[in-house]
Swiss-Prot record:
It is found in: Cytoplasm. The gene is tiprl. The keyword Membrane does not apply. May be a regulator of serine/threonine-protein phosphatases 2A (PP2A) and 4 (PP4). It holds the Pfam family TIP41. GO terms for cellular component: cytosol. Belongs to the TIP41 family. It comes from Xenopus laevis. This is TIP41-like protein. It comes from the Eukaryota. InterPro entries: Phosphatase_reg/MetRdx, TIP41-like. The lineage of its organism: Eukaryota, Metazoa, Chordata, Craniata, Vertebrata. GO terms for molecular function: protein phosphatase activator activity. Keywords: Cytoplasm. PANTHER family: GAF/PUTATIVE CYTOSKELETAL PROTEIN, TIP41-LIKE PROTEIN.
Length: 259
């Protein structure tokens, strides 16, 4: 069982015209979880659901982007794709000695896989999302710069009935002239597969846009026999061994200021 501190906190940091807010609070009450599950037409939600946790990046003009569990779960594809069914069948085979091995595949994505990339903020003005050939300068990110602000927020986590883990978390670090955010969905179904959906967001203070890069990686465990099993539980370590399934590169342009 993964242990997490549930101490509530509300951290704010100003970066030029941006206000960064990280709200961390307790797990949702079961009654609220049940109500939300009903609204989303899902039989159940992750066992650790932090529905009020949020990481928000908002400009003084009102536009911006935030990351929260509710919106992330809204884009979980609950129609059964072939990958999901095949995965569930393998999962059942992998626990054939279990009394539950004959259970019916549930009519929802029990892995909570989400390709969520954030929620755009603003009533009159919003960030304009366009495809781009520009890339986040990873070399610059490796340079040793002073960290002005750092926060990590867990959005949800589920241990898949002790057969792995599904989690979504977001962290941000602010340097003197830029900020970098990583939203990570990590899934491990023991004996079956590992999947990672990463969204990276980067902004330099003198630019009028953010760069957003989404990368989806996945591998069956059977194809990872060359990797030491202890790495299966370490997203940062296992990432390099997972083949890239999809990439999306976008520029989030700031809206024109009203005159």
């Amino acid at each position: 069982m993964m242990i997490h501190g549930f101490k509530s906190s509300n951290q704010e940091f100003n970066f030029g015209p941006w206000q960064l807010t990280a709200i961390k609070t307790h797990i949702m009450k079961s009654a609220d979880v049940e109500k939300l599950a009903e609204e989303m037409s899902m039989p159940c939600l992750p066992e650790m659901m932090f529905g009020e946790n949020v990481l928000r990046i908002q400009h003084t003009s009102g536009f911006g982007i935030e990351f929260n569990a509710n919106d992330a779960l809204k884009v979980v594809k609950n129609s059964q794709g072939s990958v999901k069914v095949a995965c569930a069948e393998e999962w059942q085979e992998s626990r054939s000695d279990s009394e539950h091995s004959k259970e019916v595949v549930k009519p929802y994505d029990w892995t909570y896989t989400t390709d969520y990339k954030g929620t755009l903020l603003g009533d009159n003005m919003k960030l304009n999302v366009v495809p781009t050939t520009e890339r986040i300068n990873t070399e610059k990110l490796k340079a040793k710069e002073q960290i002005m602000f750092f926060e990590e927020v867990l959005l949800f986590e589920d241990e898949l009935h002790d057969h792995g883990v599904s989690s979504l978390s977001v962290k941000i670090r602010v340097m003197p002239t830029s900020f970098f955010l990583l939203l990570r969905f990590f899934l491990r179904v023991d004996g079956v597969l590992i999947r990672m959906n990463d969204t990276r967001l980067y902004h330099e203070a003198d630019k009028t846009f953010m760069l957003r890069e989404y990368t989806s990686k996945e591998s069956k465990i059977s194809n990872l026999s060359h990797v030491p099993p202890p790495l299966y539980t370490e997203p940062n370590e296992i990432s390099q061994y997972l083949p890239v399934i999809q990439t999306i590169y976008e520029k989030l342009e700031f809206p024109s200021q009203p005159h």
